[in-house]
Amino acid sequence: MHFGIFHTALNIYPDVFYEMLNGDFVDVFLSEGEVEDQASAEMLKAIHEKGKKLYVSFFFWAYKHVYREMMVDVGSEYSARVVLRDGWQETVDAKIAFLRASGHWEAVEGFYIDEPLLNGITLEDFRTVTAYLRERCPDKRIFCCFSIAGVAPDVWTANNVKPITPEAGQYLTDVAFDMYHKFDEKYAYITSEMKRRLGNREDLRIWQVPCTMNYRGDKDEQHCLDHLNGCYELLKKEKNPGGLMCCTFYTCPAEVEAL
């Protein structure tokens, strides 16, 4: 079972990255920068030397926003449309070739994407790109964190988002969803719905995403501890757990250190 924290990449918070890299509780990281950037290359090298793992974000390798409006998490309707970039296959091939040539390919656990359906990616385009990644890198994992709309629209949805299907999610190996409200019975239900909509595949690794931030400005230490412990207890019930990937979007590093 892995443990990681979003938004702790070298190019975002170098001090926090090295603290976690040199510690003994974080063993997986997420890189959202360009793989060719110096910071991203240094991050991959350092992770490899420590024997830890990295997921690399692939959203902008293949997709681009046509329009993007208000964010849901500040209380307004989210509206987006995303299309495939021209020449996206060549871009994906170039990124993979760079990572392979780095000498640190072994440290790349796989590829990551965040809330693709809420962001406006169609089910067809999602399947197309993940299938291409699987074809090019059959030994690597493909990890997706869905919005609630993408897996349990009866709990929450927006902008006519079409939830995931077994066909569209066929090439995924690791999945999660993110919700940062008080931990309660809905989390088990949403997890069950996510698995059901993906065909109840036994090979899928299931992750949980604990809230370790002052989400919407009204979360405190107790909220975060309850959320973390709840996610962990839920994850321990899984036959094929992936791990915990804590989210720190608003508060890393100062308030996270305080927590």
Where are these predicted regions, by residue range?
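Glycan-processing catalytic domains of CAZymes
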Residues: M1-L259
